[in-house]
Amino acid sequence: MIKLVLIRHGQSLWNLENRFTGWTDVDLSENGLSEAREAGAILKKNGYTFDMAYTSVLKRAIRTLWIVLHEMDLTWVPIHKSWKLNERHYGALQGLNKDETAQKYGEEQVHIWRRSVDVRPPALTEDDPRYEATDPRYKTLKKGEFPLTECLEDTEKRVLAYWHSEIAPTLKSGNKVIISSHGNTIRSLVKYLDNLSSDGVVSLNIPTSIPLVYELDENLRPIRHYYLSMDGEVPEGEIPKHISF
């Protein structure tokens, strides 16, 4: 049996301010730092260890992973970073307050942008200061690869390309893997692993910094999955609450 651990980054500063974040590189809040420490302690107490770690090129996910591995005394574990594990790109919504955006465009429209699978938010323009294609972390992207906006299907396409080329072979080689990433990135992976329909993924929420464990067979088909707490596996359908850490 193969075990895979997925973890969404701890609360970010823009999560706290209720803003659309996407590819904007904001850091963790104080609460997010605490959540990451708690996640590391949970994994350590439950006897987990890792051979390889994957994350995005955004600091909120990277820092969460650093803290988790530090709490587990596993700072030696190799970390692979890829833009393909970035959060969904929210286009021209990035930086905007979600409540204010709902007042401007209507709650129904914002809900469609946020939760639908195939509808993209308004796109950035290439002269927008939020367009960061020249950032050194994206120097390997070919012309036209840097997104101006994304729907969940777009996110899923790049995430699964990286899954099949990099992560799946690592798991099949017998390595214990943790992925520290973002809400929509993990939703994309869960949709694929659990073979969820487009309707099924609409209501799927991934909590910040709670370890989600997938037990997989030799072909990486899910046997079962569950969240972890200090007391071990959490009953199906329940999500543990954070404690002060």
Curated annotation (Swiss-Prot):
- Name the reaction it catalyses: (2R)-2-phosphoglycerate = (2R)-3-phosphoglycerate
Q: Where is this site: Transition state stabilizer?
A: H182
Q: Which UniProt keywords apply?
A: Gluconeogenesis, Glycolysis, Isomerase
Entry superkingdom: Bacteria
Which sites bind substrate? 8-15, 21-22, 60, 87-90, 98, 114-115, 183-184
The cross-references to InterPro entries, in alphabetical order and at most eight, read: His_Pase_superF_clade-1, His_PPase_superfam, PG/BPGM_mutase_AS, Phosphogly_mut1
| Family (UniProt) | Belongs to the phosphoglycerate mutase family. BPG-dependent PGAM subfamily.
Q: What does this protein do?
A: Catalyzes the interconversion of 2-phosphoglycerate and 3-phosphoglycerate.
HAMAP family for this protein? PGAM_GpmA
Q: What is this protein called?
A: 2,3-bisphosphoglycerate-dependent phosphoglycerate mutase
Q: What is the lineage of its organism?
A: Bacteria, Bacillati, Bacillota, Bacilli, Bacillales
